[in-house]
Each structure stands twice: as C-alpha cells, then as structure tokens.
Amino acid sequence: MKKIIAAAAIAAFAQSAAAEEFDLNINSDAVRGALSGPLSRVFSGVTGQYDAGLIYKKGENDSPDPKDTDLTLGHFGVLATGDVGAKGAEAGAGLGVRAVFADRGSATGAALALGGQFELRMPGFERLGLSGYGYFAPGILSFSDLKSYSEYALDVEFEVVRAAAIYAGYRRVNVKPEPNGPSNADDGAHLGLRLSF
C-alpha cells in the first residue's frame, strides 16, 4: 500500500509541475510535501484550488507505544477559495473536500475529509503571515481499516522574497485504525519552506 500511495502522489506532482506553490516541512521524524495551485491546471475550465500532499513519518520499531508506528499519508483535495473581505488585512480562505489514503503500521484505509484553510497578512507587515488548515473525516466517511481521520496545522511565516517564504508551525494528524485504538499519528512542531511559481 505504501508503494501505491507514494506512486499516486508522485504522479499527481508530476502532472502538476507548473503548480503555484510547493510546500515542504520537516521535524525530527516526519516530512510533509505538498503542491497546490489553480484547479484549472488539473481540470481545464474548473475554478478553485487543488491541494496534493504526502506525509511520511518514520516510526520507532522498538517502541511499545502504538503511535510510534510508521505513517504514510497521501491526499488530494479541492477547495473553493477567495478573499474573506476583512478590512485592513489581506485575508483569504477556502472550504473543500480531501481524499485521504493512509498506511499506519498494519492498518490501511481511506477517508473523505471536509475542511478548509486560511491565510492572513496585516497591512504594513506583508512579509509576515499566519496560515492554517484543518480537515476531519468521521467514521461514516472513513473506509477499510480507518475509523476516523483529522489533521490540522498552524504556521507563522516570513516572506524572504516574493516567491519564497520560510515558516515554523505545529501540526497534528490523527489516524484511528481501531474504534478504541490510539489516534495520534503525528504531533509536533515543524520548520518549512514555501516556493511560489
């Protein structure tokens, strides 16, 4: 399953080589890569934004804690995006759906998650930004070994040049393979880089 998820993510990335934004972040045991851009680059004539990404977390094989198992999580989502109309601030948001494919230890599954994202920049401090996203799939929208899924993150970024920003943030991923099992699959701070094309 890990090979299938990785191949699907690479194929999505390759087809969208002209994406508007490439995002990569790391922490001590996980890496997340994502591409996002106008949905019309994937499906001609369609408005909105696409978002494709992959998280890989290396588990600790000798740990008795179930949350320390390997995690491979891929997603592809679509969002309706726009300006939120905040006076005196540059603020945008999006709402949409995300198809998620997860492989955690011996459990594999999929989910259809609902959620959204936001980005905020204040006038006079345009180089500083606050952004975040959150997605949730309850049991009714989770399939195979996956009983529920949620993922959220919050980042503070500094725009080094117009096409590149660095950021620090926090992300939590909950992938629940059993009704009463552990759900926390990735949790912690990260450092990242965003490149716009």
What residue ranges belong to the model's regions?
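Gram-negative bacterial Sec-dependent N-terminal signal peptides
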Residues: 1-18
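Long, low-complexity, intrinsically disordered N-terminal extensions of eukaryotic proteins, enriched
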Residues: 2-3, 76-79
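Context-gated lysine
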Residues: 2-3, 57-58, 67, 87, ...
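General helical structural elements
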Residues: 6-7, 45, 61, 102, ...
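Short glycine/proline- and aromatic-enriched beta-strand/turn motifs that initiate or cap beta-hairpins
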Residues: 15-76
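Outer-membrane beta-barrel transmembrane domain signature
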Residues: 41, 82-91, 96-197
